[in-house]
């Protein structure tokens, strides 16, 4: 189980975004995090994936703190993929940062061989997001955090990406936390909703 236990987080000089917040995501569960814009959903996603540390409380997977080194069992896929890659690296290098990526996963995501030689700025947002998803799934995470992963993509690419993500969750019995401002998408994907605000 992925658990946020009584966490408090805020940026220096500002009041906490949340105080004493707790959340549990079970394996196989797809939880939608609901809150208005500006309430700290993206920040919470970063805390749960280990990119930020809470001032108080803990983030645990099966009762253990997130590892400080190595591959994290919680992988975050962000809304803006260009912020998740090194602009100086070709995509082949970016893709293999966390290890070998199975060819079947590249095929499932529609990643073309010629894209591997390109730099991030030479790809569209949808193409770049596919790389970020492949890199995350290649680590075989137990929990996926999907923060507005398909917001700025066309409908066909959105459907393709969600098909791959949901197949992974089903096959691996992985848990998912998702943030989306599209009620129809949330209703279709989530097994449960949690209000942050």
Describe the role of every protein-language-model region.
Residues 49:
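Helix-to-loop junction immediately C-terminal to a conserved catalytic motif
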Residues 133, 145:
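Hydrophobic anchor residue at the start of the ABC signature
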Residues 80, 87-102:
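Q-loop/switch helix immediately C-terminal to the Walker
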Residues 119-123, 127:
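Conserved ABC ATPase signature
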Residues 140:
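Conserved catalytic motifs of ABC-family nucleotide-binding domains
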């Amino acid at each position: 189980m992925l658990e946020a236990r009584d966490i408090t987080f805020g940026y220096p000089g500002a009041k906490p975004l949340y105080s004493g917040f707790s959340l549990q995501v079970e394996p196989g569960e797809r939880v939608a995090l609901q809150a208005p814009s500006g309430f700290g959903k993206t920040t919470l996603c970063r805390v749960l994936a280990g990119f930020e540390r809470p001032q108080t409380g803990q983030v645990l997977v099966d009762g253990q703190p997130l590892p400080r080194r190595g591959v994290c069992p919680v992988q975050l896929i962000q809304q803006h993929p260009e912020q998740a890659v090194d602009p100086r690296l070709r995509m082949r290098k970016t893709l293999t940062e966390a290890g070998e990526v199975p060819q079947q996963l590249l095929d499932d995501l529609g990643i073309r061989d010629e894209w591997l030689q390109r730099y991030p700025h030479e790809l569209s947002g949808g193409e770049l997001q596919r790389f970020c998803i492949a890199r995350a799934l290649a680590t075989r995470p137990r929990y996926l955090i999907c923060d507005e992963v398909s917001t700025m993509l066309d409908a066909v690419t959105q459907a393709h990406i969600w098909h791959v993500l949901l197949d992974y969750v089903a096959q691996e019995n992985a848990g998912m936390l998702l943030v989306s401002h599209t009620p129809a998408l949330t209703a279709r994907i989530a097994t449960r909703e949690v209000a942050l605000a």
